[in-house]
Amino acid sequence: MTLKICVAQLNFTVGDMSGNAQKIISASKTAYAQGARLVLTPELSICGYPAEDLLLRPAFIAACDDALNTVATELASLKDLAVVVGHPTGSDSRTKSVAVQRRYNAASVLCEGRRLETYAKRELPNYQVFDERRYFTPGQGVCVFQVQGINVGLLICEDAWFDEPGHLAKDAGAELLAVINASPYHVGKGGERIERMRQGALNTGLPLIYAHNVGAQDEVVFDGASFVLGADGALAGQASSFAEELWFLEANRPETGVEPAQS
């Protein structure tokens, strides 16, 4: 069995939830028409990255949720299509009768109008241009979902720079790791990413898809160059640098391997 996957390496605009949702819908419909049954969008694709203090506004989180629902509704008729969308989410709780708002850097798996799974990023970077601990609470869960018989483990960016999240996904049954990202560029960063993800693939014994953002926000630049690694850590293929692209891959069973789709 072959699963065709589309990495939607696109430029999402901070604060334009409606426009970002339409971009995801359009890309997903195009990918579906070309045979893809799994679409991966970057980290926080619904609102753009980094959204910074906009994330502190309840109305902003609500607008993100509305946009996510729009994506789910518009793609509901596409049978068996799973779309991974990065988004912020919030939940209210009470501690000693005091209301506490917790926000998460999350990703949801949308399929036929429903949210099959929602995963919250476990590892929150707080260095250099990152200040995610200001906005988000670390997640504690694991997300493994099935598409056409293949169990996909979902990670978000910094999760893949640590060993534990990948191992937890494998222990939960993952046969393939899908990592959605918004990783700022600097000279040499591409090689650093590949080397760290190679260690993740080797440590888990699983192939790994690195789905990246492209474009810029203020002084932060995202270089695209999404890639896929085999379970042996070998680079199997890479998308364009500094350009939007719908990049297609194929995952094959019974022994799960992933490589660029043949055009």
Regions found by a protein language model. Give the residues of each.
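Enzyme catalytic cores with a strong preference for nitrogen-chemistry domains
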Residues: 1-263
